């Protein structure tokens, strides 16, 4: 069976390392699907869910808050400042953080404050969407 080695790494730890049949993740220009022997690629990724179809057919979900993707014919590497296993996502905390970001956006006075609040809001909305997608697959 053809597989591709996948590494998902955050600033703190390695979140996933193993063989997979397929990987899907949110690229900057849209959803990317990667199979073994994919053409080499380096691109930025948006906040969202990384779906890894493992060798045994089970799926692993990881939320990433953006980052970089490197694809080689036999290897996929996802680098993200923040990466959280699907099973570790907390919808209550994410919803509270999203509400705080919305409030910060309303009260923002400078361009920097607006940009920071918008960025946090985007990440939290993507985290909630990833959590819901993970729950549907369980």
Swiss-Prot record:
GO terms for cellular component: plasma membrane; proton-transporting ATP synthase complex. InterPro entries: ATP_F1_dsu/esu_C_sf, ATP_synth_F1_dsu/esu, ATP_synth_F1_dsu/esu_N, ATP_synth_F1_esu_C, ATPsynth_dsu/esu_N. Pfam families: ATP-synt_DE (PF00401), ATP-synt_DE_N (PF02823). One of its GO terms (molecular function) is ATP binding. Coiled coil: none annotated. Keywords: ATP synthesis, Cell inner membrane, Cell membrane, CF(1), Hydrogen ion transport, Ion transport, Membrane, Transport. It is a peripheral membrane protein. The keyword Cell membrane applies. The keyword Manganese does not apply. F-type ATPases have 2 components, CF(1) - the catalytic core - and CF(0) - the membrane proton channel. CF(1) has five subunits: alpha(3), beta(3), gamma(1), delta(1), epsilon(1). CF(0) has three main subunits: a, b and c. Produces ATP from ADP in the presence of a proton gradient across the membrane. This is ATP synthase epsilon chain. It comes from Polaromonas sp. (strain JS666 / ATCC BAA-500).
């Amino acid at each position: 069976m053809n597989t591709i080695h996948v590494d998902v790494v955050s600033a703190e730890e390695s979140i996933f390392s193993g063989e997979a049949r397929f990987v899907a993740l949110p690229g900057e220009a849209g959803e990317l699907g990667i199979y073994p022997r994919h053409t080499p690629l380096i691109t930025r990724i948006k906040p969202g869910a990384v779906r890894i179809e493992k060798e045994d057919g089970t799926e692993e979900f990881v939320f990433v808050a953006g980052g970089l993707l490197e694809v080689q014919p036999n290897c996929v590497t996802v680098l993200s400042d923040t990466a959280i296993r699907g099973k570790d996502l907390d919808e209550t905390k994410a919803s509270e953080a999203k509400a705080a970001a919305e409030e910060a956006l309303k009260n923002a006075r400078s361009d920097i404050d607006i940009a920071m609040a918008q960025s946090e809001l985007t990440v939290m909305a993507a985290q909630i969407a990833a959590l819901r997608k993970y729950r549907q697959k369980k």
